[in-house]
Amino acid sequence: MMAEEGITWDSPHAVEARQKKEGTFLIDGNEAAALGSIYGGVNMLSWYPITPSSSLAEGIIHWLPQLRETEDGMSTCAVVQAEDELAAAGMVLGAGWAGGRGMT
């Protein structure tokens, strides 16, 4: 049985499927923030895995190989998983004091 079979209720909040547009894609807010951070020049990410910020760090980790690697395969952004939020904040402060553009 298909999911649509037997359903008669018309939702006023239904979303119609759109045709796929060439050159566009749909992302969530954390993925957009990840891409914005990469294009904004972040070169140090320290993070502690906790909802809702984990997907932001995972987005950066996903996009770095495609967008921020040198010709010899070296990344231009360090990603460090900290043991807690305080350690992550300390790493970002250290990156800033050293002239880097860090985020947590």
Give the positions of each predicted feature.
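Thiamine diphosphate
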Residues: 1-104
